[in-house]
Amino acid sequence: MKANFTLSDGDKAVTDADGKAKVTLKGTKAGAHTVTASMVGGKSEQLVVNFTADTLTAQVNLNVTEDNFIANNIGMTRLQATVTDGNGNPVEGIKVNFRGTSVTLSSTSVETDDQVFAEILVTSTEVGLKTVSASLADKPTEVISRLLMLKAKRKSR
């Protein structure tokens, strides 16, 4: 039986002699999407397809929870890297590398979790302006950096 498929852009796909129609699905939003094939006469079938984030266009963003803390190896800040693709879709399970100058990092490499965060803690004993940075493990030349100000502990009287 011959069936016609109407695509969302108005095009149609027609079945061949074997009753198969081929369509190419494209999208920019990651996640589950329902595809419906309807035959003339009303019968239809649905299938859920999953689009994943495009790791080739992945980019990292770096947030610092506290950029002004005490340099005593007790005061700390959390670095939180998020990774998204070129369409803004979060990328899970991608490795982020961290570096820092005159600071101690809880880890130098972390994979993004199911919330698409890769987090580490930073401490230091040196007062002054320090640079911390993050990059994707597979794109080490694309680095994003932030400055941290570490201050001396105020003496109490």
Residue ranges and their predicted role:
Residues 1-157:
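The feature marks long extracellular or luminal low-complexity segments
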